[in-house]
């Protein structure tokens, strides 16, 4: 009986490993290379040897283009300047988040020279905490930064 239960446990372990490998939710930071900055919360990076569009997890910056919103251009310029001047860029996926959004963009935390870009954008008043569908890893820090930016009426919070 002990032999059979040992075999069953081993088989379940192998099945669990296979399941985890197939879903590929990597929670460690992975170094990447910027291909193109698109706007304040989206960019293209080289990820797993592929050019992929990445949506910055848990934040939203004002729109640019035809439907430009207040601080949209400033947020986009700030983000692009930060990304273009970075010595090291890393992506980190969040196990509480979907891997892709409805537009098939990878959802990730972005680190520039060790600093969380989303936290910087929220602190500077260029982004708001948005699209929260789980208990994301850096959510508490983002919420605190947003409250501080709101109280100080920085950036997008000047008018609100």
What do these predicted ranges mean?
Residues 2-160:
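Small beta-barrel nucleic-acid-binding modules, primarily SNase/OB-fold domains
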């Amino acid at each position: 009986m002990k032999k059979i239960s040992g075999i069953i446990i081993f088989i379940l372990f192998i099945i669990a490993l296979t399941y985890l490998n197939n879903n590929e939710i990597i929670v460690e930071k992975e170094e990447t290379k910027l291909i193109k900055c698109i706007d304040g919360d989206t960019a293209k990076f080289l990820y797993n040897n592929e050019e992929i569009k990445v949506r910055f997890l848990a934040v939203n910056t004002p729109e640019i283009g035809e439907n430009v919103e207040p601080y949209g251009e400033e947020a986009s310029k700030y983000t692009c300047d930060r990304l273009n001047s970075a010595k090291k860029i890393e992506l980190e996926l969040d196990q509480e988040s979907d891997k892709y959004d409805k537009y098939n963009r990878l959802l990730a935390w972005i680190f520039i020279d060790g600093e969380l870009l989303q936290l910087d954008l929220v602190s500077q008043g260029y982004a708001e905490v948005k699209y929260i569908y789980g208990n994301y890893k850096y959510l508490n820090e983002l919420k605190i930064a947003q409250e501080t930016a709101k109280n100080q009426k920085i950036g997008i919070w000047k008018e609100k």
